[in-house]
Amino acid sequence: EAVAPYERPALSKNIFYLREIADADQLVEAIKLKDGRTLDADIVVVGVGGRPLVSLFKTSIPDVYAVGDVATYPLKLYNELRRVEHVDHARLSIEEYDYLPYFYSRTFNLAWQFYGDNVGETVLFPDNFGTYWIKVVGVFLEGGTPDEYKVARVQPPVESLDQLAK
């Protein structure tokens, strides 16, 4: 649901988003859609994300450091090391700071920003388009069980909004 407003302008220009590849070999001649239609194609652009092969960077030479998109950084908000691929982070990471992951993109006449992490149940707000990911960050218990107490400590993603009503 969240991608529909971004797919519509592309579809109007005969650009299709495919989420699965089957029976792939080395030569592209056509693309078969789930609805059975076949589209002739000479080239397919695949976006799969990026993760550097950092094992190639290992060295025993002193004072050699990784910088830029291949380097991890301690994100206090999530208590873990992560790669942060954003110019804002590159400008600020010379010193310790509390960074909120952020990126943005522009497609056709649409522009959007993403803040934080996409863990938990997706909740769409259609009036002013946006998506929020719901995660437990605290609990109020009246005579709670040990398992309910653990929820506050673990802070799991919410698998279903129905869970919040229980």
UniProtKB/Swiss-Prot annotation:
Entry PTM: The N-terminus is blocked.
Activity profile over pH: Optimum pH is 7-9.
Molecular function as annotated in GO: monodehydroascorbate reductase (NADH) activity
Keyword Chaperone: no
Enzyme class: oxidoreductase
Enzyme Commission number(s): 1.6.5.4
Pfam families, alphabetized: MDHAR3-like_C
The keyword Ligase belongs to this UniProt entry's keyword annotation: no
InterPro entries: FAD-oxidoreductase/Apoptosis (IPR050446), FAD/NAD-bd_sf (IPR036188), FAD/NAD-linked_Rdtase_dimer_sf (IPR016156), MDHAR3-like_C (IPR048618)
UniProt cofactor(s): FAD
Domain of life of the organism encoding this protein: Eukaryota
Keywords of this entry: FAD, Flavoprotein, NAD, Oxidoreductase, Redox-active center
Reaction catalysed by this enzyme: 2 monodehydro-L-ascorbate radical + NADH + H(+) = 2 L-ascorbate + NAD(+)
Family affiliation: Belongs to the FAD-dependent oxidoreductase family.
Role: Catalyzes the conversion of monodehydroascorbate to ascorbate, oxidizing NADH in the process.
Protein name in the entry: Monodehydroascorbate reductase, fruit isozyme
Organism: Cucumis sativus
Source lineage: Eukaryota, Viridiplantae, Streptophyta, Embryophyta, Tracheophyta
